[in-house]
Amino acid sequence: MELFIWLLIFAVSLAALLIGAVWFSAAASRFLNKAAAAGFAAIAVGAALPELALALAAVLSGRPELVLPIVLGSSVANIFLVVGASAAAAKNLPIVRECAEAEAPLLAGSAAILWFSAADGIVFFEEGLLMVVAFLVCVVFLAARGRINRFTPRDIVAPGFLAAGRGLVEIVGARFGRGFDGHAKNTARALLRGMAGAVLLALAAIFAVEALAGAATAMAISPVLLAFSVLAATAALPEIWGSLKIIAKKRYELVMGNVFSGTAVNVLLVTGVAAMFSPLPVGASAAAVGLPFFAAAVALLTVSGFSRKISSGQGWLYL
């Protein structure tokens, strides 16, 4: 009975986490829609908000060892589950030249930074700061490539904007679907919704981390294992659903922008910000399983980028 209660709290907390991220991101994008780089930053942060909130809640609750499993697990799931399901559904999933030449190296570079930062067993403040700076550089780079001067929250899920700013925009479109359709109609309402989203995010993340620890205790297993597996699968579900909707519209080229940029943002931003609050221990499980799996996933995806397509058979192999 205790396990059921913890799992119920965990499920409700994750749902609230996504809702809070939608509200906060919609409000932030409304206030920052005049500047392309600032707007892209808001979109990128919005895409990583669930993982970022969970990571900060883990650090502030005295469980920094959960941060890297959260990041690694969600990143591995984002690559294997999202790409696998998308390729299997699309039969042949194309990878456009921009992804292969710009976004694939971006992901590989992000993975290299994380690997070397975690090599000594702890990710320190200075390494976290480096990751945040790298994230900002990525934002400016992708914003410059998109050549977007201004946009509104509604433009975030509009086809024309997606085509121009695929790198960061599609990760939010995939995660939150049409969540921005209900954005605030005026500044006051946007501010209130943003504040409510921030509060909901904070509370949901705290309850999710506590429920994760409680469920792990009830099952007599390590919380790190649940963070790497259950959180990973849960985090990948919205991306899978969003990617399948994109494939149904036959806009196959947008899926890979979701995966490449979304995973890079997740690695740099979430790990970097969390490390600036507290040193992040890598842990035996993360070092022996998480990092090698993550490196293999990134390497496989990068190699697939050179072939410019992922076949249905490769998709099933990913799964």
Model-derived features with residue positions:
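Hydrophobic alpha-helical segments, chiefly the membrane-spanning helices
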Residues: 1-319
